[in-house]
Amino acid sequence: CMVLCLVPITVFAAGGAKAILPGTSAQSILKIDKSRLSFAGHEWWVIGQKTDKSNNAPIITLLAVNNDFGDVPFRTGSAVPFENARRYSEDNGYYANNPSDMSQWRKPNEYAGSTLQQKMVSLAEAIPEKEQAVIRPKDITEGITGQEVKAQKLWAFSQEDSIYLYRNSCKYAAQWWTRSSNEVYGYGSWTIHPDGRSGSALNVDYDAAVRPAMELDLSSVLFISAAEHGKVADLTTPIAEYAGDEWKLTLHDSDRDDFTAKTVLVNGSVLEVEYKNAKVGDNEYISAVIKDADGSISRYTRVVQLDGTTNGTRGRAAIDLTDIDMTGKTLCVFNEQFNGDHKTDYAGALREVKLTDEIDEQFTLTPGGRYYFDLSAMNIPGTANSNLPDSTLHYV
């Protein structure tokens, strides 16, 4: 594992990708052992990519970058009895029992039910629900002793898997646990040294760092953007190119999909957009992007902050397109929760708005359908038609 110095700055320069990209570009822009993703309040190396054969979902594997998760024993143990523990005959020590919904361990270095495995469960449960929803559960069946563990959102690497880590992702700030036991003796498990070398087999009651891994399903990613200063709210300036490797996600939030928007007034280059059914509160916005003909995003802004007082769940927002050539482009408006640098954002489906007034009476007729048009308010002479659902309506 070679040492590579990383410069902690945001790099915007020609020749890179745009600082905001459609979610469909997420897997291709994230590079193994080079890209880092801010997610669930932590930073993660991208260490693997694949496609789910069952649904063609793009999947990435992540491994924690920083030693943010504390130290634990592989399994809590003591030389003397303690509550909810039992004796292991090989070393006459006492080790914590598995949770009641699991079979009990035969050796204390079994991963299922261990202190390390339960720590992974508690860390996963602390992740916000909408971020948990895009974590792909994994059945842990290999690289362990004892029973398998199903549907794990966070999990410890195996000792064998750690051998294949690259020069960046192999390093960590502390010696960290794998999930793999040392079969030479029944109360030891493997660790990895901070420099990435395969570590020692420690007694399971020793403390070492927790380093979680996870698999992320990118199907619900609406945008991927530079982790710092990537989503600059400025529609007048094209999105900058970004040569860095730190990214964050904007996830599609289906709870916002009843949001609607339409253009109701055009004054020169300024559109007045009427919106309804927006979420309000901290960090809630009406946002807009301009999409080029190829689907790429060329401009982004946050138009109105929805604090629930001045601006509520419905209202109007002015979008200034002065000096922007909209030929072949579309303007999309959406309801977004923008949470800042290195934090996951959430947004509803993009609503395309017209560059001209949208008249309420315009709609598409379905062939074979029956429609009634009431023009009574227009003072057109006619006779009431008793055969219509409303007999007060006139012939039209």
Give the ranges of each region predicted by the language model.
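Sec-dependent N-terminal signal peptides of Gram-positive bacterial secreted proteins and lipoproteins
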Residues: 1-12
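Collagenous Gly-X-Y triple-helix signature in extracellular proteins
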Residues: 15-396
